[in-house]
């Protein structure tokens, strides 16, 4: 199933990685706000070996699009945005409720903390956007 999703939505693995990273960081800092640099995140993902690209800047632009989507979907709030940097990012009320909810006896926050594989990240993202 993951192969079908990747074929139909080729940027989904990047979206999953960004969504899980942002949600983990905001969850860990909650209720404090964090700043996110898409360029720094792009370099981190490239160094982890999961994403190949011609330019970290190109990847940073795609990461920025994913963060914008998370905000428009009501999962995060941010206080400001300049180029590929986001300021005062925090969990939304909706995301906090999802992370605290029990799903099959396991809350989503603990699933997010353990989501290291693409399959685990996809499962978390599906629950976040449901």
Positions of PLM-derived features:
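Generic structural signal for hydrophobic core residues of well-folded globular domains
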Residues: 26-30, 70, 98-102
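Short amphipathic alpha-helical interaction segments
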Residues: 53-73, 86
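Short, amphipathic alpha-helical interaction segments positioned at domain boundaries
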Residues: 85-119
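Long, low-complexity, polar/proline-rich intrinsically disordered regions
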Residues: 121, 125-129
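Alpha-helix boundary/N-cap detector
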Residues: 13, 17, 54, 58-61, ...
């Amino acid at each position: 199933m993951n192969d079908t999703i990747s074929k139909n939505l080729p940027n989904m693995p990047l979206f999953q990685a960004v969504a899980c990273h942002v949600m983990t960081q905001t969850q860990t800092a909650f209720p404090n706000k964090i700043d996110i640099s898409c360029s720094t995140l792009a370099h981190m993902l490239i160094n982890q070996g999961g994403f190949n690209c011609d330019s970290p800047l190109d990847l940073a632009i795609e990461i920025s699009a994913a963060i914008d989507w998370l905000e428009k979907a009501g999962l995060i709030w941010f206080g400001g945005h300049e180029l590929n940097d986001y300021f005062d990012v925090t969990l939304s009320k909706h995301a906090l409720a999802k992370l605290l909810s029990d799903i099959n006896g396991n809350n989503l926050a603990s699933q997010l903390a353990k989501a290291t594989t693409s399959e685990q990240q996809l499962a978390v993202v599906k629950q976040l956007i449901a």
